[in-house]
Amino acid sequence: MPRRLSWLVLSIAIAIPALAQTPMQVYGAWHCSTDYCTWAAVSSASTFDTDNHWMIDRHMNNTYQPSVNLVIFSFIQPVKLMNLTTDAGDTNGVPNAMNASAVSYFQSRGVRVMFSIGGQTYTSDWDTALATDPGTLGTNAANVAKQFNVGIEIDYENSSSPNLTGLEQFISSYRAVIPYDPTGNNPAARLTIDLGAGDQYLSSLAAYATTNWLTTSNPVLDYANAMVVRANTSVSSLESDWSQHIDGYPTLGVAPLAPAKLTGSFFLVNSKPIANCVGPFSSSQQSAAANFVETVAPDGAGTTAGMLGLMFWAAGCQGTHTACTFPPNTCQNGMGVAATTFNIPVPMPALRPQ
């Protein structure tokens, strides 16, 4: 290369600053247990370990380096929680298999646990509970969080007319029992919300949550998860969706969200496991998206680059037409390798505020 050209290339390289890179702090999976997200049936301790060992032991050799630092048990039915229902599948509003033993299985290895309230199937139940007694629902959710020492996730997927007044009452009642904790030391204080992959789905919820609950100056919720779309959605499409949250969507009234207040998400399985689960990691969506996740710059909210991390839908058996992440379809070669590659901290540290 001619000397003049080499100096030009060097000058350009120096003039273009490297993108700031922030390691992920959240790396987890929603969990649907053995019975398609009802958590009604309690497994024996040995079966539960066989099914989930990959999550707490990425090398599958009993060295117990977890593949995740967060697991979210999905789902609690909102009306049953409001009424503290006890029936064949629930005890005081909580599914039977979301018990102290299941929580301890993960927490004893440094993995944070949360319970998710709602999900798409229970959208109408969210509507009913928020119209009936959102304050009691929020208080009961906080008491469950304290009882099991877990966080709570809000998964309310009313895309047309969400009851934001009721949801505000739910959150206020929760926070009256358990205040926001920036240190993360109190697991029960962790309160998060699910939003659409981008701002074009659940737009009203995104607009209200971003302005009222997810600011860096006066946070009420810890962060938001951008939910999955379809298993075969391209990484570039998902990055475009996530950018809608970060950049804001003015025509829909959605303000910018700090990257530090957002996780992205991928599928683990479709009709069969995919590379995010079984590997090879180099062929996975999470590998392709890692640079964006760790370097995306704030655009109107927050001061640090990089999203908070990644979530995956879903461990366990999410439905009758999809694979489960139980043997032989366990995910240590996908998520486990990624946890090492991304240097995921276990236990999860205090989350960056900006």
Where are these regions (language model features)?
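Chitinase-like catalytic core of GlcNAc-active glycosidases
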Residues: Q21-F292, T304-M307, W313-M348
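C-terminal cell-surface addressing/anchoring modules of secreted/extracellular proteins
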Residues: P353-Q354
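Conserved short secondary-structure transition element at the edge of the structured enzyme core
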Residues: V293-P298
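Bacterial N-terminal signal peptides that target proteins for export
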Residues: M1-W7
